[in-house]
Amino acid sequence: MDSRTGEFITVHQAENGVYIWEIANPLYFRIYKVEDPLYTRTRIYHVQIRFNHNLRRALHLHKAYLNFQVWTTSMTASGSIYLNRFRRLVNMYLDQLGVISINNVIRAVQFATNRTYVNYVLENHSIKFKFY
């Protein structure tokens, strides 16, 4: 859903993509919070994927933040280690696919979190399209 207008994103907008080799460093990955709930064997990573300026311009986006909460049982991986692993798997999926779009990035995250140590993945996105 477009967070500015409240309208649903169409299939054409979600599948509109650009070749990955046309844009250098198309995605920014950031962990902005790591939680260790008490008395549990889980760790929660709050990961944010931001589209770079050139990718947003090619896809006619004003803002594109994809926020994920990844609930894992992996207590040994720190935030930076998990972020490197997550980034590598997402980029590997997108490199094999060759086209980067909103839906392909979400599919790449599903590929990266389809592991035995991942329990849940919660998504919360902030996407705004350009009007002009």
Curated annotation (Swiss-Prot):
Keywords (A to Z) from UniProt: Host-virus interaction
Keyword rRNA processing: no
Pfam family, one: Gemini_AL3
Biological process according to GO: viral process
Domain of life the protein comes from: Viruses
InterPro entries the record matches: Gemini_AL3
Family: Belongs to the geminiviridae replication enhancer protein family.
Subunit structure: Homooligomer. Interacts with the replication-associated protein (REP). Interacts with host proliferating cell nuclear antigen (PCNA). Interacts with host retinoblastoma-related protein 1 (RBR1), and may thereby deregulate the host cell cycle. Oligomerization and interaction with PCNA are necessary for optimal replication enhancement.
Known role: Increases viral DNA accumulation. Enhances infectivity and symptom expression.
Name of this protein: Replication enhancer protein
The organism of origin for this protein: Abutilon mosaic virus (isolate West India)
Lineage summary: Viruses, Monodnaviria, Shotokuvirae, Cressdnaviricota, Repensiviricetes
